[in-house]
Design a protein with these regions (language model features):
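Gly/Gly-Pro- and Ser/Thr-rich, intrinsically disordered tail segments characteristic of DNA damage-repair
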Residues: 1-214, 219-220, 334, 338-349
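DNA-contacting surface of Y-family translesion DNA polymerases
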Residues: 6, 180, 190-329, 339-343
Length: 349
């Protein structure tokens, strides 16, 4: 049996904005385009959702529902940086990661040895580390397949964890409305309802041949989902851009000397992760990342530099000089060169 975790950040864009500007918290706010420019809401916080504001809603309509709604423009680079930090945490546990967007992903932790292979404890630790490192919350679902893990992550949102064990699958699926099934959109849901099928229990009363006749090849999928079956694998990103290690410290590191003391253990873990890489990758530029106590951060990389302790120490010193403030997080890594890219260049010429 597989162990799949679906991780979904809670109101991701809005959470980043509220973290970086605490004056936005505890009031209805959204990230999106301006109403006068026919903008659309990208996401909103839970205070705004209480008024009926939703993603993909026209900003003008959102303001009618909630006249006090504050709409801020998106800062996509900040969201990408946060997403990369979260994926660095994911890679501590597994390389089998399928990103669905900046703020959600599937993880296959079937072969993971952390916490004696407990997917529940891994999900708990991911949630703890994301909060500790980024000060935003994520919800997680744990189940034997992707379909159920995604439903589970939404079950106790926000800031929740829900687990569906193999023994619980049958009972859980029976009560699900068909609108929760992966691939069932409005048209299919309406057709099912006209047939008197509203839940998976209803769907199970139909045999495979009936469903194939009524829905074509999708009927086979419907039958499987109604029985809690979903064999889709976690689709791993085809190419990695870098490998890195980050650590957030319980107490801020006060000066450069304290940061340098932490470097050897980080590089030891980086070496271990690089040894697990596919042979098609070779190391490129080293880089370091610092997040200061006020959540500002800087990243520095250097072409032609080596991958030894002294090389990273030099980069760390320059990065620290940019802020000269207590440090809450240190990251070290190396950009990767994919040999397939070079082979493609040779064929071109």
């Amino acid at each position: 049996l597989r162990k799949i975790i679906h991780v979904d950040c809670d109101a991701f864009f809005a959470a980043i904005e509220m973290r970086d500007d605490p004056s936005l918290a505890n009031r209805p706010m959204a990230v999106g385009g301006l109403a006068e420019q026919r903008g659309v809401i990208a996401t909103c916080n839970y205070e705004a959702r209480a008024y009926g504001v939703r993603s993909a809603m026209a900003s003008a309509h959102a303001l009618k529902l909630c006249p006090d709604l504050l709409i801020v423009r998106p800062r996509r680079e900040a969201y990408r940086e946060a997403s990369q930090e979260i994926h660095t945490i994911f890679r501590t546990y597994t390389d089998l990661i399928e990103p669905l967007s900046l703020d959600e992903a599937f993880l296959d932790v079937t072969g993971c040895e952390h916490f004696a292979g407990s997917a529940t404890r891994i999900a708990q630790d991911i949630r703890r580390r994301v909060w500790q490192q980024l000060r935003i919350t994520v919800s997680a679902g744990v189940a034997p397949n992707k379909f159920l893990a995604k439903i589970a992550s939404d079950w106790k949102k926000p800031d929740g964890l829900f687990v569906i064990t193999p023994a619980q699958v049958d009972e859980f699926v029976l009560g699900l409305p068909v609108t929760k099934l992966h691939g069932v959109g409005r048209v299919t849901a309406e057709k099912l309802q006209r047939m008197g099928i509203r839940t998976c229990a209803d769907l199970r009363t139909r045999n495979r041949l009936d469903l194939l006749r009524d829905f074509g090849s999708f009927g086979e999928r419907l039958w499987g989902l109604a029985h809690g079956i979903d064999e889709r694998p976690v689709q791993v990103e085809s190419r990695r851009q870098s490998v890195s290690v980050e650590n957030t410290y319980d107490r801020d590191l006060p000066d450069l000397a304290a940061c340098l003391e932490r470097l050897p253990e980080l590089l030891q873990e980086l070496t271990r992760r690089m040894a697990r890489l596919d042979s098609r990758y070779r190391p490129g530029k080293p880089f370091v990342k610092l997040k200061f106590h006020d959540f500002t951060q800087t990243t520095l990389e250097q072409s032609g530099a080596g991958l030894e302790l002294e090389d990273y120490a030099d980069l760390l010193a320059v990065a620290f000089a940019r802020g000269k403030r207590p440090v809450r997080l240190i990251g070290v890594g190396v950009r990767l060169i994919d040999s397939r890219d070079q082979a493609e260049q040779l064929r071109l010429f």
